[in-house]
Amino acid sequence: MSDVAIIDYGMGNLRSVAKAIEHVAPGKRVAVTSDPAVVAAAARVVFPGQGAMPDCMRELDLRGLREVVKTAAASKPFLGICIGQQMLFEHSEEGNVPGLGILPGGVVRFPDAKMVAADGSRLKVPHMGWNEVCQRKPHPMWEGIPDNERFYFVHSYFVAPADAALVAAESDYGTRFTSAVARANIFAVQFHPEKSAQAGLKMLANFISWAP
């Protein structure tokens, strides 16, 4: 049995996630896997990914991973990253596709009308680079991470939870958006902890020790 299963549905380079977790938890068994049985048996699950939402949902289903993701998200420490966060919600404007429906709400694109910086210059989409993450509620995943710490983002869409109680952090890029959500055993982030230097490594270490 793996201590941590990183779900591989063919979207994104997952080795960087695995290497970061192995760095903070050298004694743990980390599996990058597309095998539903390995995911089901793991103590903790990481659901990362990059790419377009329609492609991600299709590849997830082609590998028969939909149900095991839903089961894991209901039963064990579960970390969603980037598109892995977005897929947890009910619907995405990207391709007008349904998500997994694990969390209430949708996924929306940065509004063009608001993509203006304080100096009047246009903000580019995708939002790419370092940005502050403002913590909106206490959570064990924030342990040792200062409020307004900077994390690394690459995205054109963001989650819009239907339940405000889900919001664990917000960030600003032309508009204020939800950058982390939390409910029970689920914690999911829009940014990339594996690309976010020491703060990101601390978050991954927190995930390894988190006991929801």
Swiss-Prot record:
Pfam families: GATase (PF00117). The active site is at C82 (nucleophile), H192, E194. The keyword Hydrolase applies. It is found in: Cytoplasm. One of its GO terms (cellular component) is cytoplasm. Keywords: Amino-acid biosynthesis, Cytoplasm, Glutamine amidotransferase, Histidine biosynthesis, Hydrolase, Lyase. Residues 3-212 form the Glutamine amidotransferase type-1 domain. Heterodimer of HisH and HisF. It catalyses: 5-[(5-phospho-1-deoxy-D-ribulos-1-ylimino)methylamino]-1-(5-phospho-beta-D-ribosyl)imidazole-4-carboxamide + L-glutamine = D-erythro-1-(imidazol-4-yl)glycerol 3-phosphate + 5-amino-1-(5-phospho-beta-D-ribosyl)imidazole-4-carboxamide + L-glutamate + H(+); L-glutamine + H2O = L-glutamate + NH4(+). GO terms for molecular function: glutaminase activity; imidazoleglycerol-phosphate synthase activity; lyase activity. The keyword Lyase applies. Its main location: cytoplasm. Transmembrane segments: none annotated. Its EC number is 4.3.2.10, 3.5.1.2. GO terms for biological process: L-histidine biosynthetic process. Pathway: Amino-acid biosynthesis; L-histidine biosynthesis; L-histidine from 5-phospho-alpha-D-ribose 1-diphosphate: step 5/9. IGPS catalyzes the conversion of PRFAR and glutamine to IGP, AICAR and glutamate. The HisH subunit catalyzes the hydrolysis of glutamine to glutamate and ammonia as part of the synthesis of IGP and AICAR. The resulting ammonia molecule is channeled to the active site of HisF. It comes from Aromatoleum aromaticum (strain DSM 19018 / LMG 30748 / EbN1) (Azoarcus sp. (strain EbN1)). This is Imidazole glycerol phosphate synthase subunit HisH. CDD domains: GATase1_IGP_Synthase.
